[in-house]
Structures are given as C-alpha cells and as structure tokens.
Amino acid sequence: MSGWYELSKSSNDQFKFVLKAGNGEVILTSELYTGKSGAMNGIESVQTNSPIEARYAKEVAKNDKPYFNLKAANHQIIGTSQMYSSTAARDNGIKSVMENGKTTTIKDLT
C-alpha cells in the first residue's frame, strides 16, 4: 500500500499536513499554515521535491538524534521528519519520503 497525505486543522485554526507511509507511520510533518490553500501548496511542493535527493538536509538535533528537513528549490523547509535513533534509520526515512511523497492521495480531515 502506498502512502498518503493527511490535511488537518489545529486548535488555533491553522492548517498542517503529514505524509504517512503505507503502514500508517508519519514520515514527514509540515509547518503550520494560516490558510488551507497554503497547506495544499505545501503538499504540492512535497510531491514535486520529494523525489530529488538534493532537497534533503540531513541534520542532528541538540540531543544528538538524527533527522532531516525536506526543502524546496528556494531552500525553504517544506517538512521535517521525526527524530531517529541512528543515521541509517534517518536515511531509510528519506527513502520512504522519496517513495511515498509522490502520492496524490490526500485525506482532508478539516
């Protein structure tokens, strides 16, 4: 089963999306958007940029946990991963976003 996007509305009336793998695990989380159209544009940007390996910035948090950001061509962060236990796990997360990010399935929970 391939992945999907879930679009949701936060308690302060802002919008965000997550990308889920086929097993239902969240593999990428967006920033908050003030409008639904901004979040939809963010999903479109992930669909465009997720197959491009150069768009992934491999990072390490202050607690030494590896994670990654997916960036657009203008270097703006589109989405952020979870914190991983190892760099190998992070790299597998990137592969999962590269594979699942192209999906056109969007579950609108707003």
UniProtKB/Swiss-Prot annotation:
Sequence-type repeats, residues: 10-58, 61-109
Repeat as UniProt keyword: yes
Keyword entries, A-Z: Repeat
Domain of life of the native organism: Bacteria
Stored Pfam families: DUF1508
Keyword Repeat part of the UniProt annotation: yes
PANTHER family registered for this protein in UniProt: PTHR40606, UPF0339 PROTEIN YEGP
Family assignment from sequence similarity: Belongs to the UPF0339 family. Duplicated subfamily.
Name of the featured protein: UPF0339 protein SO_3888
